Curated annotation (Swiss-Prot):
Its main location: cytoplasm. Pfam families: Anticodon_1, tRNA-synt_1, tRNA-synt_1_2, tRNA-synt_1g. ATP binds at K605. This is Leucine--tRNA ligase.
Length: 835
């Protein structure tokens, strides 16, 4: 099988089979899988994503589209730095070696990529464009630097965006993330929050789960900002944001974030307060609050109620208010908010009901809308009316106003690492922050770097960061932070439209290809890459790089490939190939010691539950692997790797070769009967396989093609064979299977005597009239109970059906000589005779 696969891969390369033109009279179709990080080797878990995309690309080509199906490398990132430290070599060497190996692997799987458009994000010819783009953002005040609390990963020694913190830990290292106050570069994604939110409803071809995740991440809240004066220091106020300002008369405390500026100014930091602040610093994002027990510590400060100066409220540092949401301060209304209620019970704060409810708010918060009570001038109003009224009062008093807040925060793009795109800025003691002139781009990373594992090597480089200021020509230093790698992946799909363009994009080419018609990748990118790419597209539209404002028309999120995990007696992970099963138990192949089988999980390097691609290719071939990862479950669902599954796919491919030999040896028999049912099945399969592929029901399409192959095999085994229909059916089967298993189908197609390549052919056409059956079977009922069945010709009339069914012996038995009162027909399904 490997020889056949290598043969066709060579032919496709020589014939430039999958290179496409930007100038074609055909309609365009752009299918794209999320570009991989060049980690070293592709395992079978990766293959599923690429196989799905390849089926769609090949199918749409057969449907008459000019299909763009490119591939490239998301090549910056920390793993390369870790490898550099471990091997004492430059990350570039490790990265380019991995790219070479992985490209070879992808080609060996027969994927129909247009390699002439390949991009590599660590190539200066690529990242020079995003450096220029960053400077354009800076000129528009969409890029800025400020000091802020950031998520610091102490293992990777870098800052993480909120989206890169999962359950309080770094998404790559798994280390517990802490807060640090650092100067960072940000992009103003919040300027586009409203459009990003509103446009979600137009992404009709995206999974509802992803759209919902983005809506929640952007998190629009409508409410009010208003001020509380601090008791005994009334010139100073605390500004709060609330989505339920109408409950102001139920306030019993002010909650502030652990890093609220008022703490530095006015709060005496007791050991209790300092310990609590340290504890809070480990909470890095609002999603973690749901799992955190509500706690607080009193600051010693009180504020005055805005509508009743006799009421004072304690100011409490809480662990459920974050500085990066709203103003970093809230007023707590325990009777009508679950978090506030939990804290009030714990700290013995008052719980005052201000919305009518048939429940005891001392025990549980009532969080629904209703009629206001115990609320002075708001009494008797609905929650909505009271909200408008109280905001009006804030505005009259000059202490507040209506406002909108978003959970989404500006994107922190600074990373304290070497292997990333340098941020093209210079810091001058005289001139301040100075952009690198366009003519001096790209700012390229140095080759002579020392990786000792501590911090960012660019900070310690003896010469790279030292430059003269472009404004005053005095000594200055370069920015040593590099871009978050999501910067590169936020626009790469535009570069594919013309990867040789002298500017960031070839607008004409982008106008032809964009938006991407079908984007394929993991749902884990819903609120990182997919949101950033949407943001970039909007800004690049305004900079006249592209005409679209949304990058991806359709999105498909594939399921993961799973495999069992194994551990030895020392709790070390083992690779599947190191384990052998004896009976119902597992043992280490070399030591013969007992092995514990763990959970079935996503294939990952850390748990070693990977299946090596090259080993599987040697054993079964690329086509069998492709077929298996697509056939055992719907592509949006997880798939468990199984030896029996891949062996079954290998047998099916061998069966195709056997069928070819059997059919090739057949002689035409003019006396054989036409197998109308087989002919109907051929046309039925063409129609429904096309529909299945369009709807990404690839496993169902494979099942239909297996059914057709079984029907053809059954016909071959007969004494009298309808050779013409068998040959036609087998030709169709080979064509239908081509997007799934392209090597063996091209080989068989050639052996069938065909000159044209399958990749150049149109998808088979079906004849609708052939789908009609000559006969159909109807259920015959008497008084609603099944008494018989009867096969009718399609040409039969309703009167004939009634006459035949009434005269059936089994029906006559129940009629007992009576005439039917009524006969009800459900066409081609049921005859119900009423007596």
């Amino acid at each position: 099988m490997n020889q056949i696969e290598q043969k066709w891969q060579y032919i496709w390369q020589e014939e430039k089979a999958f290179e496409v033109s930007n100038a074609s009279s055909k309609p365009k179709y752009y299918v794209l899988e999320m570009l991989p990080y060049p980690s070293g080797k592709i395992h079978v878990g990766h293959v599923r994503n690429y196989s799905i995309g390849d089926v769609i690309a090949r199918f749409m080509t057969m449907q008459g589209f000019n299909v763009l199906h490119p591939m490239g490398w998301d090549a910056f990132g920390l793993p390369a730095e870790h490898a550099a430290i471990k091997n004492n070599s430059h990350p570039k060497k490790w990265t380019y070696s991995n790219i070479k190996n992985m490209k070879k692997q992808l080609k060996s799987m027969g994927f129909s990529y247009d390699w002439s458009r390949e991009i590599n994000s660590c190539d200066p010819e690529y990242y020079k464009h995003e450096q220029k783009f960053f400077l354009e953002l800076y000129e528009r005040n969409l890029a800025y630097q400020k000091e802020s609390f950031v998520n610091w990963d102490p293992v990777d020694n870098t800052v993480l965006a909120n989206e890169q913190v999962v359950d309080g830990r770094g998404w790559r290292s798994g280390a517990i993330v802490v807060k640090r106050y650092l100067k960072q570069w940000f992009l103003k994604i919040t300027d586009y929050a409203e459009e990003l939110l509103n446009e979600i409803q137009n992404l009709k071809e995206w999974p509802e789960a992803v759209r919902s995740m983005q809506e929640k991440w952007i998190g629009k809240s409508i409410g009010a900002n208003f001020h509380f004066k601090i008791k005994d220091n009334e010139e100073t106020t605390i500004e709060v944001f609330s989505t339920k300002p109408e409950t102001i008369f139920g306030a019993s405390f002010i909650g502030i974030a652990f890093n609220h500026p008022i703490i530095e100014r006015l709060v005496s930091k007791t050991p209790e307060i300092l310990a609590f602040i340290t504890q809070c610093s480990h909470i890095t994002r609002s999603s973690e609050l749901e799992k955190t027990e509500r706690e607080g510590v009193f600051t010693g400060l009180f504020v005055i109620h805005p509508f009743d100066s006799n009421i004072v409220l304690p100011v409490i540092i809480t662990n459920f208010v974050l500085m990066d949401y709203g103003t970093g301060a809230i007023f707590g209304c325990p009777a009508h908010d679950e978090c506030d209620h939990e804290l009030a019970v714990k700290m013995n704060l008052s719980i005052k009901q201000v919305i009518k409810a048939d429940m005891d708010v001392q025990k549980t918060a009532y969080t629904e809308d209703g009629i206001l009570i115990n609320s002075d001038f708001l009494n008797g109003l609905t929650s909505h009316e009271a909200k408008q009224e109280v905001i009006g009062e804030f505005e009259k008093l000059g202490i507040g106003k209506r406002s909108v807040n978003y959970r989404l925060k500006d994107w922190g793009i600074s990373r304290q690492r070497f292997w990333g795109c340098p941020i093209p800025m210079i810091h001058c003691e005289i001139c301040g922050i100075v952009p690198v002139p366009y003519k001096d781009l790209p700012v390229i990373l140095p080759d002579d770097v020392n990786f000792d594992g501590h911090g960012n090597p660019l900070d310690h480089h003896p010469s790279w960061k030292h430059v003269n200021c472009p404004k005053c020509d005095k000594p200055a230093v370069r920015e040593t932070d590099t871009f978050d790698t999501f910067f590169e992946s936020s626009w790469y799909f535009m570069r594919y439209c013309n990867s040789n363009a002298t500017e960031m994009t070839d607008k004409k080419a982008c106008d032809y290809w964009l938006p991407v018609d079908k984007y394929i990748g993991g749902i884990e990118h819903a609120v990182m890459h997919l949101l950033y790419a949407r943001f970039f597209t909007k800004v690049m539209n305004e900079q006249n790089y592209v005409s679209v404002r949304e990058p991806f028309k359709g999105l498909f999120t594939q399921g993961m490939v799973l495999h069992a995990t194994y551990k030895d007696e020392h709790n070390n992970w083992l690779y599947p190939e190191e384990v052998v099963k004896k009976g119902n138990e597992f043992f280490h192949k070399e030591s013969n010691n007992r092995v514990v089988q763990g959970r079935i999980e996503k294939m990952s390097k850390s748990k070693k539950n990977l299946i090596d691609l090259e080993t599987m290719q040697e054993q079964y071939g690329a086509d069998a692997i492709r077929l298996f990862v697509l056939s055992d479950s719907p592509p949006e669902k997880d798939l468990e790797w199984s030896a029996s599954g891949i062996e079954g796919c290998s047998r099916f491919i061998n069966k195709l070769e056997y069928m070819f030999k059997a059919i090739d040896s057949l002689k035409d028999d003019v006396n054989s009967e036409v197998n109308k049912e087989l002919n109907r099945l051929v046309h039925f399969t063409i129609k429904h396989v096309a529909e299945d592929i369009k709807h990404f029901a690839l496993n169902r399409a494979i099942a239909r093609m297996r059914e057709l192959s079984n029907a053809i095999s059954a016909e071959i085994s007969k004494d009298k064979i309808d050779v013409k229909t068998v040959r036609h059916g087998f030709n169709v089967l080979v064509q239908l299977l081509n997007p799934f298993i392209p090597h063996i189908t091209e080989e068989i197609w050639q052996k069938l005597g065909n000159k044209e390549r399958l990749y150049n052919l149109s998808f088979p056409a079906f004849d609708e009239s052939m789908l009609e059956l000559d006969t159909y079977i109807m259920a015959v009922q008497v008084n609603g109970k099944l008494r018989d069945t009867y096969e009718f010709k399609t040409s039969v009339s309703e009167d004939e059906i009634k006459q035949v069914t009434v005269s059936l012996p089994k029906v006559q038995k129940f009629l007992e000589g009576q005439e039917p009162k009524k006969i009800i027909l459900v066409p081609r399904k049921i005859v119900n005779i009423l007596v």
